């Protein structure tokens, strides 16, 4: 089916759904039609704008062919054609992007997990910096940032930390943050002024609902134990810490941040559900195409995606060769949009090239 035929088909379907909704249907049929109608609304607006500009361009080109045109009128028409010819490809691209297969998880909230990698205490300090950066970004976007768990090192670093970030389309914005983030800086404990390189791993998971992943009680092993502090000492006299193991997959989540065993269990189940949902999505994507990448880069958590160089004040994303000399804005204030928008645009361009 050609691009034009596809647009006609979408407009026809939209109009038919509109007539159906106006005919007085009720119940499940009405709910289904309303959902489909709402899903098409955005692309229909773009198609109509594209068709309008395309028609105006054709009219202007036909008008230019008329013989009896004075110079002023001809210049005005040529200017209009110039504007329309520049606008039309942009509108067409917007339509084509809207036609791309949607990631069903894009509209979901997300769970972010940050873990210290190679580099010892400096890596743990960097993990804390990254975690706080995402918290600032969530605040900037108006999302709700709920800390699920933090494993402190005792001097401000995080061995690992996780949070739930709730809001519209959170996962679509943050999914490209998964991977290895590297830092180059002089640690505060470095007396010789030598630059150290360390790393932290970020994983972004779509927050799954019960309808996305069903977990059977028989598939879970739940262990409770006393929570411990950074030095290993017990900090609670009750068995409030929880470890949940999903027996079929072997995935394990342990939580001890809350004093309440019930709260730790609820948070652990939320993380477990997200990890199982992500594994389900990964397997589904692999079955669809072993060769095609569905994210910028491989989406592999072992892939080095970004370097933060404090000495030169720069942040470099290696997947799209973008370097910004504004490390304070990015790290301290969570100004990540320039990276995220470029990553999304690059991903869309790759997908368009595969059509």
Swiss-Prot record:
| Keywords attached to this entry | Cytoplasm, Methylation, Protein biosynthesis
Q: Does the record carry Metal-binding as a key word?
A: no
Q: Which Gene3D superfamilies match?
A: 3.30.160.20, 3.30.70.1660, 6.10.140.1950
Q: Which GO terms describe its cellular component?
A: cytoplasm
* Primary residence: cytoplasm
One term of GO molecular function: translation release factor activity, codon specific
Question: Hey, which family's this protein in?
Answer: Belongs to the prokaryotic/mitochondrial release factor family.
Protein name (record): Peptide chain release factor 1
Species the sequence originates in = Rickettsia typhi (strain ATCC VR-144 / Wilmington)
| Organism lineage | Bacteria, Pseudomonadati, Pseudomonadota, Alphaproteobacteria, Rickettsiales
What gene is this protein translated from? Answer: prfA
């Amino acid at each position: 089916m050609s691009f034009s035929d596809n647009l006609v088909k979408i407009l026809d379907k939209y109009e038919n759904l509109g007539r159906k909704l106006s005919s007085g249907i009720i119940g499940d049929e009405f709910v289904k039609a309303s959902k489909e109608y709402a899903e098409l609304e955005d692309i229909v607006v773009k198609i109509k704008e594209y068709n309008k500009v395309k028609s105006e361009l054709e009219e202007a080109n036909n008008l230019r062919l008329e013989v009896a045109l004075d110079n002023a009128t001809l210049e005005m028409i040529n200017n209009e054609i110039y504007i329309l010819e520049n606008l039309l490809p942009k509108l067409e691209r917007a339509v084509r992007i809207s036609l791309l297969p949607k990631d069903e998880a894009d509209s979901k909230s997300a769970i972010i997990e940050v873990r210290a990698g190679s580099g010892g205490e400096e890596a743990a300090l960097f993990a804390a910096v990254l975690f706080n950066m995402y918290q600032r970004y969530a605040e900037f976007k108006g999302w709700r940032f709920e800390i699920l768990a933090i494993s402190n090192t005792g001097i401000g670093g995080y061995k690992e930390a996780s949070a739930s970030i709730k809001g519209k389309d959170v996962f679509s914005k943050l999914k490209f943050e998964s991977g290895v983030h590297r830092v180059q800086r002089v640690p505060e404990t470095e007396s010789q002024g030598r630059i150290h390189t360390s790393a932290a791993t970020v994983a972004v998971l779509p927050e799954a609902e019960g309808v996305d992943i069903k977990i059977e009680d028989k598939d879970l092993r739940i262990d409770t134990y006393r929570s411990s502090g950074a030095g290993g000492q017990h900090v609670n006299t009750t068995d409030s810490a929880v470890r949940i193991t999903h027996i079929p997959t072997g995935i394990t989540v342990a939580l001890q941040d809350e004093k309440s065993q019930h709260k730790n269990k609820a948070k652990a189940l939320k993380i477990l559900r997200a990890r199982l949902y992500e594994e389900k999505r990964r397997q589904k994507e692999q079955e669809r195409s072993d060769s095609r990448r569905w994210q910028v880069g491989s989406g592999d958590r072992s892939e080095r995606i970004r370097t933060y160089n404090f000495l030169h004040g720069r942040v470099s994303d290696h997947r799209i060769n973008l370097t910004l000399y504004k490390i304070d804005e990015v790290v301290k204030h969570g100004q990540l949009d320039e990276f995220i928008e470029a990553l999304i645009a690059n991903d869309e361009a790759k997908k368009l090239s595969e059509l």
